[in-house]
């Protein structure tokens, strides 16, 4: 079941759902708008000959922060990691789905490549997989609305929520745009 605006507000008011900083004007009929943080991870395409998800490649990305009051410019065909300004904390019986903003999609901005699902129990910034599929650069302003978080009620609380030792969670408590940790549980079989 998708939560409505009144259900989202109720979950926040009793402290079960955390969105920090929270701005009530960001609540939509069935989602909460989230904003773009000011840090980005860009790929160092001269450090490695290829990306191998089986290997730890610590220098694959570099953290970039635009100058105060300046945007980050995402060029056509470029892919970078960003993150939400908000830290989101989900209880064990709510899952999240991050969706892009329609107005930004119409400009050629993709908010996530594949990872739009947020497990129950997750807490941290949500990493964004930002791509420009337009033929012109797109300016990304820290603090701008970048997506919307939809919340789904589970049929029961997760037995092993994200962050539990049984779940094998790699990104619990992440701050800022977090690079891939695929190598931690990579399996060739």
Curated annotation (Swiss-Prot):
Pathway: Pyrimidine metabolism; dUMP biosynthesis; dUMP from dCTP: step 1/1. It comes from the Bacteria. One of its GO terms (molecular function) is dCTP deaminase (dUMP-forming) activity. The record marks 116-117 as: Important for bifunctional activity. DCTP binds at residues 101-106, 119, 127-129, 148, 162, 174. InterPro entries: dCTP_deaminase (IPR011962), dUTPase-like_sf (IPR036157), dUTPase_trimeric (IPR033704). Belongs to the dCTP deaminase family. This is dCTP deaminase, dUMP-forming. The lineage of its organism: Bacteria, Bacillati, Actinomycetota, Actinomycetes, Mycobacteriales. The gene is dcd.
């Amino acid at each position: 079941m998708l939560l409505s605006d009144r259900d989202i507000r109720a979950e926040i008011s009793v402290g079960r759902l955390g969105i920090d900083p929270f701005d009530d004007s960001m609540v939509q009929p069935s989602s909460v708008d989230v904003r773009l943080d000011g840090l980005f991870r860009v790929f160092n395409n001269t450090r490695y000959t290829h990306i191998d998800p089986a290997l730890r490649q610590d220098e694959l990305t570099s953290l970039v922060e635009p100058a105060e009051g300046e945007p980050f410019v995402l060029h056509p065909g470029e892919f970078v990691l960003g993150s939400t300004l908000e830290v989101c904390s989900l209880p064990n019986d709510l899952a999240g789905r991050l969706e892009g903003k329609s107005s930004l999609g119409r400009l050629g901005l993709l908010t996530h490549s594949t990872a739009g699902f947020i497990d129950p129990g997750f807490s941290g910034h949500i990493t964004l997989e930002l791509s420009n599929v337009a033929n012109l650069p797109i300016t990304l302003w820290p603090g701008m609305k970048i997506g919307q978080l939809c919340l789904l009620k589970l049929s029961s609380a997760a037995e092993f929520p994200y962050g539990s030792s049984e779940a094998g969670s790699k990104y619990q408590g992440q701050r800022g745009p977090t690079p891939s940790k695929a190598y931690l549980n990579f399996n060739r079989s």
